[in-house]
Regions:
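Short amphipathic alpha-helical interaction/hinge segments
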Residues: 159-162, 166-169, 206-213
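Short linear motifs at protein or domain termini
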Residues: 1-94, 98, 140, 206, ...
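Conserved amphipathic alpha-helical segments that form helical-bundle/coiled-coil interaction surfaces
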Residues: 81, 102-163, 177-185, 193, ...
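Anionic, Ser/Thr-rich low-complexity intrinsically disordered regions
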Residues: 10, 172-176, 194, 204, ...
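Alpha-helix N-cap/N′ positions at the starts of helices
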Residues: 65, 88, 110, 174-177
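Short, flexible turn/loop "capping" segments at secondary-structure junctions
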Residues: 30, 62-63, 131, 174-176
Length: 214
């Protein structure tokens, strides 16, 4: 944290704390104080105060008067998020198929190639990273800012659960097949099929994350 640039310090503190809460580094019920975070992160109170305010708006923490209590993501939150993703992510794939450019095609192809490479190596850590990139890229390729602005924060909040899913190789194998089918639909310009496949993918992910089905 000590080498962060001052112009984006509050944003970077927010990203750090948000990620640590979502990943479970800060546990639900844990109390965070400005002094504690100053000591841990090596920054002043001002960016920490701004980050805490934003985290409270995201309902990841709540102010107790003596500090900020971590709320994290509950099972009910996860279910709500996945239900929203189920209804919106198909639209992102639909518009990505409609609006994809040559540059976008190259970027998406690169991500899919990386997924296949890391899958062949059983490299779970890099698979987690490119899984995030695959979904983020579809949002970007949609060209619809409202869709991207809605989905990307929700996907960040489920990152911890999605990354745990990579440890289940059967589910990971199915995810690879689903991603490739979505990719093929997008690059072929079949918007309706891309929407259908992306929606099905989220349905399957929701069943695994919430109900434990592969």
């Amino acid at each position: 944290m000590r080498n962060y640039k001052s112009t984006s310090l509050a944003d970077q503190v927010f990203d750090k704390l948000e990620n640590d809460i979502i990943q479970g580094i800060y546990q639900r019920g844990e109390l965070l104080t400005e002094l504690k975070l100053v000591e841990q992160l090596g920054v002043s109170r001002t960016p920490i105060r701004e980050a805490l305010r934003r985290l409270e708006q995201e309902r990841l923490i709540e102010d107790t008067g003596k500090g900020s209590r971590v709320l994290g993501i509950t099972k009910e939150d996860l279910e709500d998020i996945m239900n929203i993703r189920q209804r919106i992510e198909g639209l992102a794939a639909y518009y990505a198929a409609k609006n994809i450019t040559p540059d976008g095609l190259r970027e998406l192809t690169h991500i899919v190639d990386l997924q296949e490479f890391y899958f062949s190596k059983h490299d779970k850590e890099h698979l987690r990273q490119v899984d995030d990139e695959f979904h983020d890229m579809i949002c970007a390729l949609s060209g619809r800012s409202v869709i991207a602005d809605t989905l990307i924060p929700l996907m960040r909040k489920t990152r911890r659960y999605r990354r745990v899913a990579i440890d289940n190789w059967e589910r990971t194998t199915r995810t690879m097949h689903e991603h490739h089918a979505i990719f093929e639909a997008i690059v072929s310009g079949n918007a309706e099929l891309a929407e259908e496949l992306a929606t099905e993918h989220i349905v399957h992910s929701k069943r695994y994350l919430i109900e434990g089905e592969n």
